[in-house]
Amino acid sequence: MIQSMTGFGKSQLQLAHKKIIIEIKSLNSKAIDLNTRIAQAYKEKELAMRKLISDTLERGKIDFTLTVENTSETSTSSLNESIIRGYIEQMRAISPNGPDVEFLKMAVRMPDALTTPVEEVDEAEYVQIEGQLVIALKHLQAFRCSEGAILQKDFELRIGNIQQLLVQVETLDTERLAAIRSRMEHAVEEIRARVDENRFEQELIFYLEKLDITEEKVRLANHLNYFLSTLEEPQSNGRKLGFIAQEIGREINTLGSKANHAQMQQIVVLMKNELEKIKEQVLNIL
């Protein structure tokens, strides 16, 4: 079962005087690319949280935020009066006739005007936070699975379209080879008397073998089936699907170069169109 790398997970933890909010977002990336924004009080646990996220999600561009909302009726912050007075005095020196009320409004917004005590986080609280992180990760993984199921249906549809086009190639191939043989025989009809018959047949067979696409058709059919079977594997493997898609592309390109038949080349163009859509979506598979 495939998974998308796109996902979102969220969880919340209500404690005595605060609420912890955890959010994780994921987009596609070749490797794990983890960005974190963590409230200062929990910075010492950042490495442990990063490891848990990386081990769980494996790949993707991940944005992880842990924020704290104060739910207490009293504020834990206090005004740093000496610093605020210092700011106001500097403003008065610059503008002696300025209003003190406006100076105060500006001063309380300046750096270090508010003091918030550093909160100690005990191990029991972190265990609860880690539990909520696990829940958020599960929500994100469920999102990835849901997106993966949608992508899988799209892959199956497009692989099926290529398989149907390959059936049309099979139907046209006999006609194509007969037409090529006829054109060649007609082209040399005037000089046939001067050409050894056996030699002519040998050259004709050699040329037709160069245009033969039997092996390409067989390999393409095998690659298409392999892609479908890989979709059903227990573990999502976007890299493997990408490699198979490359092999499918090689066989389709060879069909196009050997075709020498207008209708068959049109079919090859349709195959390439379906494959490009597959390749775009494979980039988002875990």
Language-model regions: role of each:
Residues 1-286:
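N-terminal intrinsically disordered, cationic/polar leader segments
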